[in-house]
Amino acid sequence: MSRTIMAFDFGTKSIGSAIGQEITGTASPLKAFKANDGIPNWDDIEKQIKEWQPDLLVVGLPTDLHGKDLETITPRAKKFAKRLQGRYGLPVELHDERLSTSEARAELFSMGGYKALSKGNIDCQSAVVILESWFEALWGE
């Protein structure tokens, strides 16, 4: 059975999202949700979850380059993951998101130049990078 996985790139002003299929190991950007100090409009997230019906949620875990928690943002991303699990009853996994934004910027720039580098596009592409990295870790690549 192939699972549908939804990923989130947590931020205090914007939360990017992506969807992917475990069988293909690929992901596509969905929507960037505006956040107020890290708190999204939960109704918008619920609509997306109902539409796509994922089996699992993956939240990017922000750390420094050595894999250590960042003082302010890491605990907030963990709290966001716990809220997702509590609200929607879906399993949630945290996944290392180191350098995902840099990779997302590079991919977007190669596809559309500076015009493609909007905040929402970057956040959603970061969620794609996080999810595809999660797939690679799942398969041991």
Swiss-Prot record:
The reply on keyword Nuclease is: yes
Question: Which cell locations does it reside in?
Answer: Cytoplasm
Q: Name one GO biological process term.
A: rRNA 5'-end processing
A molecular function GO annotation? nuclease activity
Enzyme nomenclature, EC number: 3.1.-.-
The cross-references to SUPFAM superfamilies, in alphabetical order and at most eight, read: Ribonuclease H-like
Which sequence ranges form a coiled-coil region, renumbered to this chain?
Answer: none
Q: Which Gene3D superfamilies match?
A: YqgF/RNase H-like domain (3.30.420.140)
Q: Which GO terms describe its cellular component?
A: cytosol
Q: Which UniProt keywords apply?
A: Cytoplasm, Hydrolase, Nuclease, Ribosome biogenesis
Any single Pfam family the record assigns to this protein: RuvX
Its annotated function is as follows: Could be a nuclease involved in processing of the 5'-end of pre-16S rRNA.
State the family named in the UniProt similarity comment for this chain: Belongs to the YqgF nuclease family.
The family database entries (HAMAP family) matched by this protein are listed as:
Nuclease_YqgF (MF_00651)
What is the designated name of this protein? Putative pre-16S rRNA nuclease
